[in-house]
Design a protein with these regions (language model features):
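Structural signature of nuclease core domains in nucleic-acid processing machines
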Residues: 1-244
């Protein structure tokens, strides 16, 4: 009995920090976003709601809508992000100029025709004509707009998952959509194509506030400048949302 008890004691031992093997060394912002979807919200990434009443529209418009339906979710978000990454602000005064820019992206193989088809030029025009878009345009024309900035930042594992040991550190990597300088301070901008209804802006804030805090912290460390404002721009709502 004593031998059996000793064997059970030795081989039945459970390592108290077994969960640590599940803690990754590095995670991406996309991984954290997926985790937030499962835990915190039912927000689904897509650009447009289907209308409650189906209007009578010309066939060519209906065909475009069908193409948009087929090209949904993250792929559509990627298309919008590509336009904003490559947007030439000195050629944004008209719808025609914006259309020519998108055509040029297709011609240069920076965007597929399917991606271009799902872009509503009016969405880009609304952004550029808005207050935030005008500030970004001014920064771009002065060489003070920066886009697609990669970063890596360290966070405690417990901040990512409460089940993980807070003493462990995890590297979070991602890409900042855009930021620009006003004086000696930074304005941070993140584009979203998530499907939300007007009046539900807080859903975006709840889902992405930690992500933008990581971005702001990374920028402050990289540049030594203070991030004075953090914005989410929703293409669905055609609205900028200032985070506190």
């Amino acid at each position: 009995p004593e031998i059996r008890a000793e064997l059970e004691k030795r081989f039945g031992f459970v390592y108290p920090y077994e969960y640590r093997k599940d803690i990754p060394v590095k995670v991406s912002v996309s991984d954290l976003k997926k985790k937030s979807y499962h835990e915190d919200t039912d927000i689904e990434e897509a650009v447009y709601f289907e209308p409650d009443i189906v209007p009578l529209v010309p066939r060519f418009i209906e065909e475009k809508k069908e193409a948009e339906k087929a090209f949904t979710g993250s792929a559509r978000g990627t298309a919008y992000h590509r336009v904003m990454e490559c947007l030439e602000y000195n050629k944004t005064d008209s719808t025609q100029q914006l259309k020519e820019q998108i055509d040029a992206l297709v011609q240069s193989k920076k965007m597929s025709e399917a991606e271009a088809e799902c872009i509503r030029i009016s969405d880009i025009q609304s952004f550029v004509n808005g207050a935030l878009g005008q500030r970004m345009k001014a920064a771009a024309l002065s060489g003070l707009l920066f886009r697609e900035q990669p970063f890596v930042i360290s966070r405690s594992a417990a901040e990512i998952d409460e089940a993980w040991d807070s003493q462990e550190r995890v590297l979070v990597q991602g890409i900042i959509d855009a930021y620009f300088l006003e004086g000696d301070e930074i304005v941070l901008v993140d584009y979203k194509t998530d499907r939300v209804r007007r009046g539900e802006e807080q859903k975006l804030v709840d889902l992405y506030h930690t992500q933008l805090e990581d971005y702001a912290q990374a920028l402050q460390r990289m540049t030594g400048r203070r991030v004075k404002e953090k914005y989410i721009y929703s293409f669905t709502l055609k609205k900028e949302i200032l985070l506190g």
